[in-house]
Amino acid sequence: MNYLVTGCSRGVGLEICRVLLEQGHTVYGIARGFSNEFQQLQEENQEHLFFKSIDLSDSENVRKSIFKDFISNKLRLDGLVNNAAMAYDDIITNLNLEKLKAMYAVNVFTPMMITKYAIRNMLLHHTQGSIVHISSISAHTGYKGLAMYASSKGALEAFSKDTAREWGELGIRSNVVVPGFMETSMSSTLTDEQKDRIYKRTSLKQPTCIRSVAETVSFILSDKAGSITGQNIHVDSGTI
């Protein structure tokens, strides 16, 4: 199977690539930067892991930068993981429109455009493909300072549900995996006290395991999840 994964170079995106490679799939990864961890993974999987550096804030050039210069119509795409994201954290009264637009470009507009062309590829090859969007528990549980970021993930979740309804008749599935708080570069600026407050809101009193999220994504991409579409699957250490 051939899978496209955005935000592949670190964190949960890197782990998703690792899990898919372990299962014998071929992964086409895109991200702004190229991490040492991804480089090592690519060296270990030279024939099955490919990378292209792309500015994911440039939503208008998705077709050329990804689906012409990287993944052509000759390649059958079996699945897509929209994982790339950026955070814009602040309280609502400090909202900056330019920063909000920049975040929405990466978190909403580009994933929507990538989905558009991924579905076109699936239609061309008569593929019953699977699309997985990575959201955030912040879209479901209120956190101070995360209103803007949470709203972008909420938009992505609504888009996924309608995508599922629109294309399900042709066997194309769309789902969302909703991770809880994970120890990633996006959370590195939080203090231990802030992290402890987040942990206390979970049933397991611990961060969400990145590997668990990646394994869930792999399952949703697979035929084993063939009857699952239009859903939000929470992997969040029981944040209730």
Annotate each PLM feature:
Residues S9-R10:
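Conserved glycine-rich cofactor-binding loop
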Residues N83-Y88, G238:
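Conserved NAD(P)H cofactor-binding loop of Rossmann-fold oxidoreductase domains
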Residues M86, T93-M113, V132, L156:
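Catalytic Tyr-X3-Lys loop
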Residues Q206-V235:
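C-terminal substrate-recognition "lid" of short-chain dehydrogenase/reductases
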